Amino acid sequence: MPTLLQHAQIDWDDQGRPHSRHYDDVYFAVNEGIEETKHVFLGQTRLAERFAHLAPHACTVIGETGFGTGMNFFCAWQLFDQHAHSDARLHFVSVEKYPLDHADMARAVRLWPELAAYTEPLLEQYVAVHPGFQQFTFAGGRVTLTLLIGDVLEQLPQLDAQIDVWFLDGFAPAKNPDMWTPELFAQLARLSHPGTVLGTFTTTGWVRRSLVEAGFAMKKVPGIGKKWEVMSGAYVGPLPGPCAPWYARPAVTQGPREALVIGAGLAGSSSAASLARRGWQVTVLERHEAPAQEASGNPQGVLYLKLSAHGTALSQMILSGFGYTRRQLQRLQRGRDWDACGVLQLAFDSKEAERQGKLAAAFDPGLLHCLARAEAEAIAGVALPGGGLFYPEGGWVHPPALCQQQLQHPGIRVVTHQDVLELRKVDEHWQAWAGDQLLARAPVVVLAGAADVLRFEPCAQLPLKRIRGQITRLPATASSQALRTVVCAEGYVAPPREGEHTLGASFDFHSEDLAPTVAEHQGNLALLDEISVDLAQRLAVAELDPEQLQGRAAFRCTSPDYLPIVGPIADAQAFAEAYAVLGRDARQVPDVPCPWLGGLYVNSGHGSRGLITAPLSGELVAAWVCGEPLPLPRAVAQACHPNRFGLRRLIRGK
């Protein structure tokens, strides 16, 4: 996956229109742009009629090639507002190779003051837009935008979705020949179904013939303005072949839209919020007296991207998750609940410096860039042992605030002091039991209690492990207030929040005791010395009594491959029997449906990356539950799938 971001290179003509240097063409006609969009994309696909006939909670999925300035999205959203049921939903998926930066986007959308109700929410969330899948949520979850940042022929093959309406846009074939190819049309067909419709400006003969070959029935129709003719069509080809059954979509749960979420930390609150935004009534069962009492309860967590220069599944998820979390944080109070103060990772040895150099060469400077020591000290506000890698969009978060914000949806009910010990499936409903007491029941359950998901028999074989971590709370001093960014080496220290710095965090693979220890406080103070002797002196660490220090310990929960475990759960024994042939030939794809435990899902294993991966994993769970486009590339979603471990056991003969 390419990781370098190329923003659109734009010139502005004397009429205020953006002109693309890449394609030597304007994005839209200055006087007729909106009317052209309404005629070609909204009118020819009969979108108003489609929206008007949407049932409550039903979702229309629009796919687009070429997001550009977002005009088509804004017009579709406006039409949706005008015609759709208040409980219906719109999911808009668009590919863009050269996204506009924030300044250019803001300048472009000012040309349409009549669309301000739709352009302003995008501008508010238009942050951390990096290569890959980037998801946005608007109108309380009624509208979802998934931007695929990159080349259309690299991004669309990774999309797992079923598109209802195609806006085949992008610059004209003569200006953008690399996009208009049979490979593109094959992807449109793969993602379509009988009844999918398509609109496009182009009437080029070979484009029409290629679309027909791909399975679309196309026709020319009267155009608008200077465009005499345009094209519309419908998909009449065959359904695509099924994917491997162990990664196939479970049947969408029918009946009442009610769900249980077990656990009210980051994973649980994110799962609950994503379902509630889709019209589900969610009951969250939490064993403690309040949400965010375990690993999600630390005073400050670091929004830090530990990436690979090689585009691994984990790196792709981190890029997508980071953007999604940053957009969610815009709703919280900066300074109290979070701060985009940046994160500086020190190059503490030669190996780390080499790693940072490779990352800086692989990613956009707006995401990360190397700093020399003097530059790093100027940003951090304290003396440092060297330079490092700076993430300007990173920062710190108060995790309980994010959990509470997600749980405030009116469709969510949190019930505390509910320690679920057992699940039973009775009459298409899952029942949550504590001994002989029935706590709650619903057709859908999401297990989000970190390593505690192992207590439930369907998850017992998941290879989750707990790692104890302890943070230390240090009272801020007048001179320690100078720290202006999170600084990391082997540990991390954050700028003060409510008069305290958070310092951490230890890693203990053996202890099961959650009482903070003096030894680990001392270990954290040693980590602070490695980060900045100057800051340690400003905090008067030498005068602190480790036995009097405050802190907290919790368990991180992680998987062997460091990816979270997110998705539907299958019956482990039936799974092993159904696909036993893989033990003899891993290339086999048996034509046997996966034995799903209908309505049961998991969201766990986020390790120390929960702030980045858990919120987007809530969206991933909701997409599995509701049959919506996945918010991650298909291969990344599969890399997070619970079935990956059962497959590995079969293939390795264990």
From Swiss-Prot:
Cofactors named for this entry: FAD
Chief location: cytoplasm
Catalyzed chemical reaction(s): 5-aminomethyl-2-thiouridine(34) in tRNA + S-adenosyl-L-methionine = 5-methylaminomethyl-2-thiouridine(34) in tRNA + S-adenosyl-L-homocysteine + H(+)
Coiled coil: none
Gene Ontology annotations for the cellular component aspect, listed alphabetically: cytoplasm
Residue ranges, annotated region (tRNA (mnm(5)s(2)U34)-methyltransferase): 1-236
Keyword Hydrolase: no
Similarity comment text for this entry: In the N-terminal section; belongs to the methyltransferase superfamily. tRNA (mnm(5)s(2)U34)-methyltransferase family.
Chain's role: Catalyzes the last two steps in the biosynthesis of 5-methylaminomethyl-2-thiouridine (mnm(5)s(2)U) at the wobble position (U34) in tRNA. Catalyzes the FAD-dependent demodification of cmnm(5)s(2)U34 to nm(5)s(2)U34, followed by the transfer of a methyl group from S-adenosyl-L-methionine to nm(5)s(2)U34, to form mnm(5)s(2)U34.
PANTHER family, per the entry: SARCOSINE DEHYDROGENASE-RELATED, TRNA 5-METHYLAMINOMETHYL-2-THIOURIDINE BIOSYNTHESIS BIFUNCTIONAL PROTEIN MNMC
Stated name of the protein: tRNA 5-methylaminomethyl-2-thiouridine biosynthesis bifunctional protein MnmC
Organism: Pseudomonas putida (strain ATCC 700007 / DSM 6899 / JCM 31910 / BCRC 17059 / LMG 24140 / F1)
